[in-house]
A protein has these predicted regions:
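Non-heme Fe(II)/2-oxoglutarate
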Residues: 1-59, 65-67, 102, 109-134
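Short, isolated positions in well-ordered beta-strands
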Residues: 14, 179-180
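Catalytic core of non-heme Fe(II) oxygenases with the double-stranded beta-helix
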Residues: 63-177, 183-200
Length: 200
């Protein structure tokens, strides 16, 4: 499925290729995936943007060639009752690092870089913020092992809640308010599917 889908975004700055899971590219997979989500999550709606004909996308495939930075996937509709995001690894190795702090505003990338903080997002782009920062220094051993791609000062006040070690054949379901990032443990590339949901 992934290989047959058209490229949606080729972000050379983040070094990531994104493809939307369009409906009807593989109707069998569409049915299996959507019915399994309903079985696990109960009543929900997709929150992955829509096609030109108004159909929901089932998620976003992301092929990363560099670790993604500290961010949150809360979406861009302040009136939506956001629910869960589902991360499905398609290759190994890889990790997603989740932090204890939550975020309840729009999708945001967290940075202590003053130039980056002046970024003015277009519709559908992450805001920038340093409001995640606290006073306590981040654990140096944890930084060296998992987060060496992030300035340790940009992790001040943060505490790791969970490190999800990617395993093909699994899906991780978490609240969308979790601040998270990729780990620096990357073997050339990382490929996964992320699906965002909201309450009906």
């Amino acid at each position: 499925l992934y290989e047959s889908l058209p490229v949606t975004v080729n972000n050379k700055k983040q070094n990531v290729i994104k493809k939307r899971w369009l409906q009807n590219y593989n109707k069998t997979l569409d049915k299996i995936y959507s019915s399994k989500l309903k079985e696990i999550l109960g009543e929900f709606e997709m929150d992955n943007l829509k096609s030109e004909t108004g159909e929901d996308f089932f998620g976003l495939f992301h092929e990363s060639f560099a670790p993604l930075p500290l961010h949150v996937d809360t979406g861009f509709d302040e009136n939506a009752l956001i629910y869960k995001q589902i991360v499905t690894p398609l290759i190994e190795p890889g990790d997603t690092v989740f932090f204890k702090k939550r975020w309840y505003k729009q999708s945001t990338t967290f940075t202590n870089n003053e130039e980056e903080l002046n970024f003015k997002p277009k519709p559908g782009q992450n805001a920038r913020s340093k409001d995640h920062l606290g006073e306590i220094e981040f654990d140096k051993d944890m930084h060296a092992k998992y987060l060496s791609h992030i300035d340790i000062n940009n992790l001040r006040g943060m505490e790791v809640e969970m490190i999800y070690n990617w395993k093909v054949g699994e899906s991780l379901i978490v609240d969308r308010t979790h601040i998270h990032c990729a780990s620096s443990r990357l073997n050339k590339r990382k490929l996964g599917l992320t699906t965002f949901t909201k309450r009906k």
